[in-house]
Amino acid sequence: LLDRLSNLAEETVIEIIDKIIENKIKFVDQNHHEATYANKIEKIDGKINWSESAELIQAKINALNPNPGGWFIFNNERYKILDADISSKYGQPGEVLDENLIIGCGNNSLKILKIQRQGKKPQNSKEFLLGSKIKPGTKLLNE
């Protein structure tokens, strides 16, 4: 998606520059009373709080992908969740519920589809669990 949007933006920027050169664009001042301010996205904004709803966590993962991404800390290592789906399973927030890497959230749970351990390559959940210390029953506390 990022690559497709990048290519689309490139074409659009070239088109807009051509129109500016040809004086075919009318500039309009911004209405400062209707404008809103968005804070700069910081790395800490991607930190996952497992007590939040699975929908909110999934939205955060999608919105902040690829950087800074939705992430959590376990045993002093950062794990970035690259893709996840909502699951109807219930468990304690932060608890790994089964071998499909389903993690309990505030209301239901999140099934992790793709994850990346700090300094490692992205993996699907099955590959990840084979070599991970994160197993069913593990509690991912909000460190």
Named regions from a protein language model:
Residues 51-143:
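An anion-binding loop in the catalytic cleft
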Residues 1-87:
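Active-site-proximal loop/hinge segments within enzyme catalytic domains
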